[in-house]
Amino acid sequence: MKERILVTGGTGYIGSHTVVELQNSGYDVVIVDNLSNSSADVVDNIEKVSGIRPAFEKLDCLDLEGMDKLFTKYPGIKGIIHFAASKAVGESVQKPLLYYRNNLVSLINLLELMPKHGVEGIIFSSSCTVYGQPDVLPVTEEAPIKKAESPYGNTKQINEEIIRDTVASGSPINAIMLRYFNPIGAHPTALIGELPNEIGRAHV
């Protein structure tokens, strides 16, 4: 039986590519996305690329009750890859409370639900912004964490601390945090790539 993975933000740029790779590697994938910056059409394109249609639920990770029901609907989820987040540095300066609510509460909800539903691991999509203005280039994993320069960056730093504290408390969770820089490009098929809703609407 295939291992089941939950991908939050799975219709986004990085999420959709990850879903394709997971399916090509033999995993059963469930996507959760509120479609705030993407389209359900991405699910169709994922199917065209991989030949497999992933399960998709339009749902906000802030909805604790809804997420609880999702884990019940899709039993046996082994791990979560958590991409769902508000992600624009400039917007985070203008709307800090939106970013703190979306980015912190969504993670907390997942961490609270994981032990209840026997989910063993989470990969958290952090960011290079946790390094602030680095002293030395290129930046390595050993670079010190600096004061965040935006609410967005601060949410990523706080989320990392939440994960560390949760694991240190004895919670039965394994966690990996990815601090990557801005990804670019598109799938060779050109069926999935970066196309935020605002840009898509501008070209209609």
Q: Language-model segments: which ranges?
A:
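Short beta-strand segments
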Residues: 31-32, 58, 124-126, 176-179
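Conserved NAD(P)H cofactor-binding loop of Rossmann-fold oxidoreductase domains
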Residues: 84-87, 126-127
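Catalytic helix-loop patch of NAD(P)-dependent Rossmann-fold dehydrogenases
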Residues: 94-112, 116, 121, 130-182, ...
